């Protein structure tokens, strides 16, 4: 049986003064034979940079997934089940739980119900497609971020690839040497991104991406979501750019803007949005609700704060009833948003409900988007 080694990460909050240490996270590393397989595959991909992206992705996934599955069978336990977290003593004395799956208690904890990630990591993890675009950029020679060969896919997607500064929420992850984890590529300006990113994504989706296209995508990729929201700098603030995908049945940016306008007219507090024409298609730009005056806020999703009651509006209300800073003010907002989603048929999900931590508990963050239920 292969012995599992762990990589230690330090979990801080960059939304709280002096960036206190929340705890320690331990990620299992891939065995040496799989790390060697990955290194060999990346070198092989680098020599095939003119091959279509779809072919490269398929070959990489097939080789690495087969190797990881083989090791998991030998170890008689999946790699994902081995993640560990432990709160710091100072946080145990003065902090708060950073998810329903991480109660404020001593000792090492594992994700509930054999989940792949803790909730706070799932809130920041990139989707598989975005991660693959990063991987291909590295294979073609990008020097933007150092990614260890023995890092598993979930460690890459949740720690090593989200941007070191523009990541979701207010949790910063550092190495034991104190270096902030994540991509170091500069976040693009809106004026440059409006022209470059849509074209780069179109090339990637059609299997025609080159290194320049991949870097354009990777630099703006900091947030989770199927539609690969891209972060751009507009003036002094960061905004989230949402674009359509090739397999969309309708214009997702346009329909999201329709829902946001209807919500505002219904008295629901929302993020600020605007539509922008980019190369003949439409993009939706949304203000970041996990930032205030350019600084991060400590946010967690309803999915993370409810754990076993995912998808339940009652579970969302319980967050405010049990640990809300102002439940009398926020509970009517929950009802209004619930009624809006039900009456309009808009797709709703617990990961899209964000809560901001204040001194006396959680506050409901403004709504930041619905999508058509297609």
Residue ranges and their predicted role:
Residues 1-374:
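Phosphate/dinucleotide-binding and metal-coordinating scaffold of catalytic cores
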């Amino acid at each position: 049986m292969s012995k599992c080694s762990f990589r230690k990460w330090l979990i801080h909050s960059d939304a709280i003064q002096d960036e206190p240490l929340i705890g320690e996270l331990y990620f299992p590393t891939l065995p040496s034979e799989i790390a060697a397989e990955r290194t060999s595959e990346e070198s092989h991909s680098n020599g095939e940079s003119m091959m279509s992206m779809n072919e490269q992705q398929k070959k990489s996934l097939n080789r690495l997934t087969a190797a990881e599955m083989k090791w998991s069978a030998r170890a008689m336990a999946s790699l994902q089940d081995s993640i560990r977290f432990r709160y710091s003593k100072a946080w145990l004395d003065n902090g708060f739980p950073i998810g329903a799956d991480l109660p404020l208690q001593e000792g090492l904890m594992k994700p509930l119900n054999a989940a792949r990630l803790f909730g706070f990591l799932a809130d920041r993890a990139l989707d598989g497609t975005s991660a693959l675009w990063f991987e291909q950029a590295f294979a073609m020679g990008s020097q933007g971020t150092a990614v260890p060969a023995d890092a598993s896919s979930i460690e890459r997607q949740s720690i090593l690839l989200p941007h070191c500064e523009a990541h979701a929420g207010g949790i910063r992850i550092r190495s034991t040497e104190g270096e902030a984890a994540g991509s170091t590529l500069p976040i693009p300006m809106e004026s440059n991104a409006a022209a470059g990113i849509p074209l780069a994504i179109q090339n990637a989706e059609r299997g025609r991406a080159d290194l320049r296209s991949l870097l354009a995508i990777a630099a703006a990729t900091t947030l989770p979501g199927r539609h690969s929201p891209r972060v751009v700098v507009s003036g002094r603030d960061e905004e989230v750019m949402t674009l359509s995908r090739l397999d969309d049945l309708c214009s997702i940016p346009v329909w999201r803007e329709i829902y946001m306008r209807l919500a505002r007219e219904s008295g629901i507090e929302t993020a600020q949005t605007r539509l922008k024409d980019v190369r003949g298609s439409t993009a939706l730009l949304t203000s970041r609700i996990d930032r205030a005056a350019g600084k991060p806020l400590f946010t967690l999703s309803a999915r993370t704060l409810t754990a076993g009651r995912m998808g339940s509006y009652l579970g969302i209300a319980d967050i405010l009833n049990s640990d809300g800073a102002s439940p009398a003010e926020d509970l009517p907002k929950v009802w209004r948003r619930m009624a809006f989603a039900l009456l309009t048929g808009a797709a709703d999900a617990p990961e899209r409900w964000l809560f901001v931590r204040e001194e006396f508990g959680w506050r409901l963050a403004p709504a930041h988007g619905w999508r058509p239920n297609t």
